[in-house]
């Protein structure tokens, strides 16, 4: 039988001791001394208790003298309504909720408003999830957590007014720059440790800590979110049973897999996974499916790549311990004092982390072989250069602001004159061919080039093997620059198309040294190494194709 709107309010009650105010003031809770009403009370009957709006329902007449003189009571704030806000872009979408940026018309304050469909919540049995998230967030008052300012509702939806973390998910930056340098890794790990110390001190286990659930505010400090699977421990309990799987495969603790229980130490396991990912660019436990990931977790089967920071490695090894009572930071190991005293945090001042200026996000790109050079890239600088196609010059970079020299005009229809073979598996084309010559080149490619099958019948303009890096890991790929334009990369051993670097007007190549070059895109920087030492030729050809695609003439100035 379908529930009424009022029954849904009762199905998602605020705890009897705390009711959320419906205004974004510094203090977000107020006392509620009367017990909540029974779910069985019909919607038309007056009752005293708390509602999803964060206000109390009208009580029946009382002999209490304060209630006989309403003028002596403080005025109740008006309930917020959807029309009080101007809703903007979607910030995120979940299985039963959507988070939208909204500006309150009366104050011009921005919030991330989480909108939940009542019907869908009931149908999918997600009422406990919603209740848990709201109740946990109402207990938190710390700068490293997303803040719940207010709740309200209409006939069809629930609305949670949350603090707006303008810089989005931490995962976005890991994907963008690959690996954090040691300074960035240390600072953001320290903020997560500080947040967990507070959370566990409140008797709360997050149970789904991962980079997607760690947001960054306008000042680039962390704000942890998503408490739908969190657990509030009773005073005499140290762990929580899980009747079903909670968490995300790559970060789930072994005790949840083997004992179906989670404890505060389970969050410390996730912390170890996150530190590893900040440095290496990928989580420690990776496989083709969740079952294989779980097998690796319960066997503690993972490896550190070369050039992993030694002190960070020692910290990860002390967190990724199968016995939950042996993890650094857990109660059995004397709590957070020894964790914060680890040598990796030697330079951290813990008292005022949220007031410190976060370090600039800087990529860590150690040399992969003895004859390579280390590369460091400042993420803010990369962002500021997206509007400019010109490749920056530096002491270790080749200036590629223009094509080196105009190629001579060709005559006749001998298409071989356009092809420059670099070795048996690499070549590039001059781009001065006619449409008829292009057709002949494409026929030649289709008939004899083994990589033609991967390029959707586009003419290959340059190709060759590269080492494609993701964090501290590198994979050999065949890079194929084609008309379109497209940049495909193929697994040369298994002959499988692995992906494509997305083209846009913001795409920008950058040579760092003879072997290493970057391809910057708005959402990610691709780190590539040409083993033949011709990184500058890749950048020159990519830029030449960019000019043909986005500029009216090849000689137009770079904007």
Swiss-Prot record:
Disordered: annotated segments: 25-83
One GO MF term: phospholipase activator activity
SUPFAM superfamilies tied to this protein: PH domain-like, Protein kinase-like (PK-like)
Catalytic activity reported: L-seryl-[protein] + ATP = O-phospho-L-seryl-[protein] + ADP + H(+); L-threonyl-[protein] + ATP = O-phospho-L-threonyl-[protein] + ADP + H(+)
Assigned keywords, A-Z: Acetylation, ATP-binding, Cell junction, Cell membrane, Cytoplasm, Kinase, Membrane, Nucleotide-binding, Nucleus, Phosphoprotein, Serine/threonine-protein kinase, Transcription, Transcription regulation, Transferase, Ubl conjugation
Transmembrane stretches, start-end: none
Bilayer disposition of the protein: Peripheral membrane protein
Region of interest (PIF-pocket), residue spans: 116-160
Function: Serine/threonine kinase which acts as a master kinase, phosphorylating and activating a subgroup of the AGC family of protein kinases. Its targets include: protein kinase B (PKB/AKT1, PKB/AKT2, PKB/AKT3), p70 ribosomal protein S6 kinase (RPS6KB1), p90 ribosomal protein S6 kinase (RPS6KA1, RPS6KA2 and RPS6KA3), cyclic AMP-dependent protein kinase (PRKACA), protein kinase C (PRKCD and PRKCZ), serum and glucocorticoid-inducible kinase (SGK1, SGK2 and SGK3), p21-activated kinase-1 (PAK1), TSSK3, protein kinase PKN (PKN1 and PKN2).
UniProt protein name: 3-phosphoinositide-dependent protein kinase 1
Species this protein is from: Rattus norvegicus
């Amino acid at each position: 039988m379908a529930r009424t709107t009022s029954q849904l309010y009762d199905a998602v009650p605020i705890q009897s001791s705390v009711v959320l105010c419906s205004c974004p003031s510094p203090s977000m809770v107020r006392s509620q001394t009367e017990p909540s009403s029974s779910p069985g009370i019909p919607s038309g009957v007056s009752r005293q208790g708390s509602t999803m709006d964060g206000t109390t329902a009208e009580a029946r007449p009382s002999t209490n003298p304060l209630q006989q003189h309403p003028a002596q009571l403080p005025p109740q704030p008006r309930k917020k309504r959807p029309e009080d806000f101007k809703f903007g872009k979607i910030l995120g979408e979940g299985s039963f909720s959507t988070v939208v940026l909204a500006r309150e018309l009366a104050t011009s304050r921005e919030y991330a408003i989480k909108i939940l469909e009542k019907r869908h919540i009931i149908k999918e049995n997600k009422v406990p999830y919603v209740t848990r998230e709201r109740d946990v967030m109402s207990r938190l008052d710390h700068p490293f957590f997303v803040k719940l300012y207010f709740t309200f509702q209409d006939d069809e939806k629930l609305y949670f007014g949350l603090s707006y973390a303008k810089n989005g998910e931490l995962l976005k930056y890991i994907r963008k720059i690959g690996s954090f340098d040691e300074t960035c890794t240390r600072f953001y790990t320290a903020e997560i440790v500080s947040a967990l110390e507070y959370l566990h001190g409140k008797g709360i286990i997050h149970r789904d800590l991962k980079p997607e659930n760690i947001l960054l505010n306008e000042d680039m400090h962390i704000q942890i979110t998503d408490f739908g699977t969190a657990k509030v421990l009773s005073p005499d309990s140290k762990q929580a049973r899980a009747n079903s799987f909670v968490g995300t495969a790559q970060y789930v603790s072994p005790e949840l897999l083997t004992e179906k229980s989670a404890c505060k130490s389970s969050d410390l396991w996730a912390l170890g996974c996150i530190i590893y990912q900040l440095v290496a660019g990928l989580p420690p436990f990776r496989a083709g499916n969740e079952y294989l990931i779980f097998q690796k977790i319960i066997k503690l089967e993972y490896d550190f790549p070369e050039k992993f920071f030694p002190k960070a490695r020692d910290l990860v090894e002390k967190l990724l311990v199968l016995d939950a009572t042996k993890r650094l930071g857990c109660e059995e190991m004397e709590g957070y004092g020894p964790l914060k005293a680890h040598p990796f945090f030697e330079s951290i001042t813990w008292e005022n982390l949220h007031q410190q200026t976060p370090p600039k996000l800087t990529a860590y790109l150690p040399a992969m072989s003895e004859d390579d050079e280390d590369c460091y890239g400042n993420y803010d600088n990369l962002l500021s250069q997206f509007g400019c196609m010109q490749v920056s010059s530096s002491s270790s970079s080749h200036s590629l602001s223009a094509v080196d020299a105009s190629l001579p005009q060709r005559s006749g229809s001998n298409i071989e004159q356009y092809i420059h073979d670099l070795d048996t598996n690499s070549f590039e084309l001059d781009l001065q061919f006619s449409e008829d010559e292009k057709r002949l080149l494409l026929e030649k490619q289709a008939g004899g080039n083994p990589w033609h099958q991967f390029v959707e019948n586009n003419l290959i303009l340059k190709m060759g093997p590269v080492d494609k890096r993701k964090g501290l890991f590198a994979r050999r790929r065949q890079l194929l620059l084609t008309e379109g334009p497209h940049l495909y990369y193929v697994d040369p051993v298994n002959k499988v198309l692995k992906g494509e670097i997305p083209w846009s007007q913001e795409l920008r190549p950058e040579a760092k040294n003879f072997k290493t070059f970057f391809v910057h895109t708005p959402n990610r920087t691709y780190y590539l190494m040409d083993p033949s030492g011709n990184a500058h030729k890749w950048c020159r050809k990519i830029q030449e194709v960019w000019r043909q695609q986005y500029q009216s003439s090849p000689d137009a100035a770079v904007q």
